[in-house]
Amino acid sequence: MSRLAFLTSAAALLLGCNVSPARLTGGVELPERGDCPRGLAVVSTDFLSSEIALLAPNGDVKSPAFMSSASTVANGLAAPFSGDLGVATARSRPGELVVLDRLGTNVLTFVDTRTGAVRAQLPIGTGFEANPQDYLELSEQEAFVPRLGDNRSPGREPFDAGSDLLIIDPSKPAITGSIPMPRRPGFWPNPAAVVQVGGDVLVTLQHARADYSGMDESELVAVTIENPRQRYQLPLTGLENCGRAELSPSRAVLAVACSAFVDRKGAVAKLETSGLLLLDATTDPPRELRRFLATELVGEPLQSSIEFVTEHVVLFKTQTALGSELDNQLFALDLETGKSTLLASAARASNGLGFGIAFGGMSCRAGCGDPCLVADLSRAKLLRFEVEADELVPRADVEVDGAGLPPAAVTPFW
């Protein structure tokens, strides 16, 4: 879905929350686990203020207020956090968390999860509202950052075209380059997410109009890691507003969820452009294996994020408008049978109307023996599920208990 719709939906229903900055609880030593993450970072926010907590892989809270928008020079922050934070979804250097501060700030922050010390901050706005969406570290000297925002007056600063893929040297840190994304007449490219597949990075382009009044079909663009350049374009025919292409545990299958164009209240007009696409990651370029249209799955639009539970089961969420008669629902989908199983429904807002975007980030590492966690803004908790033979079994919810902000995202770190 569009970031604007998410902010509008959640902020409107959280308006009036009286939260006070919690005392920072600092870093935490968690054991390294090889390819399995050592912990989870949870971003809680009312989109005015924000807080990051650190959890053990099983969901136990280890540092409820690791960092927050109240953080100051005690952490080495030159630019304080805003209320619109994200955390890099892919692996970076051991123990380090990369925090993306989006609208209004446009800064990357590199922070040690063990000590809470900030190694560096890097402004990446280059003179315009860049709105960074993701961070993918490929080596100690190379990382990619998709910038959603476009610059209507480029040419005043280096690397200021916008709606591009920025190249970063994390060791300095510094901006070292920019890769333009393919443009369609009347639309911005809007790169929203990145994932590494072999020697390429697949960039999801959402192709929105400048005023976000509509969208074109999404596509995946492959960019080579060595000597970065565009290698191919893969249209996601018939689907709009798609999210990150997620790899299955075996890395043989890619799954992409698409929500359709979402207006400022979270409503969808063209349900037929929402769905879930499976691609064969072993072919070059990836070949479509199967698609599940929203009209066939649950009769409601999907949110544009998905999470593999096992090789054959994924989690997906429905998209509902602010104040509607419907609420977000969380489903497990069996990719072999096509059967969807309802796991949870969002709580109603205090005014009795639909909460809008209630279910946020998801994280599953069943292969590591870890539970699945799903951010639930409507209950201000993380839903927790154990995975038993492709089945998800509800366990005790997780309460972060920091400044009282609801969790919006949950992301692994190594």
Specify the residue positions occupied by each region the protein language model found:
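A short beta-strand motif characteristic of beta-propeller blades
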Residues: 22, 61-80, 117-125, 174-184, ...
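Bacterial Sec-dependent N-terminal signal peptides
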Residues: 13-40
